[in-house]
Amino acid sequence: MSPTGTRIDHDIILDIVPRGAKVLDLGCGDGSLLEKLVRTKDVRGSGIEISDEGIRECIARGLAVLQEDIDHGLKDYPDRSFDYIILNQTLQAVKKPHVVLSEMLRVGEKAVVGFPNFAHWEMRMYLLLRGRMPKTEYLPYEWYDTPNIHFCSIEDFDGYCDRFGLRVERRIYLSNDRGGRVLRGVCPNLFAESAVYLLSKK
């Protein structure tokens, strides 16, 4: 959270997406990010969510949302039908991350991807000292009820982008530790709790 009580990753994404853009938010949850984009950036926004609860909350916010499983792809959407496709704090929960990321850059001109960094030093120490699966603000679940199935680090994601020829236009590293900005810049894989990437095709 920021000092004003807003989510830092949401603030970053609000800064990335230009006013009036056509946006699709995948795994939009309760619609809080999409609602901010619609209200503050005047985007033409819609969302996709799989949970019944998330759908109800999005509808209550007056958002355009479809109930679908993004692991099945975005076959109903033509190429380049959106300016920005967002996948925030959802990458680790999808069954087929490569399919989802590929579809994002087929359907959208640019992709915004936010994910928790499983190589953060606190995660490493938690596992080393406690011998248990780590729990953090971004990964608050117990091992037996977590929706997360594909954990990755910042180094993992950079390697993925290199392997599949994705252009990284921006990388923003996030942490609740304000004093860690320099350390995040020097060694983000160790000191960033999460990251937000802006991607496009080369």
Task: Label each region the model flagged.
Residues 98-103, 110-202:
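S-adenosyl-L-methionine-dependent methyltransferase catalytic module, highlighting the catalytic core
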Residues 19, 80-81, 107:
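Alpha-helix C-terminal capping/helix-to-coil transition sites in glycosyltransferase folds
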Residues 27-29:
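Class I SAM-dependent methyltransferase "Motif I" SAM/SAH-binding loop
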Residues 73-79:
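Short conserved loop adjoining the S-adenosyl-L-methionine
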Residues 84-95:
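A short SAM/SAH-binding and catalytic strip from SAM-dependent methyltransferases
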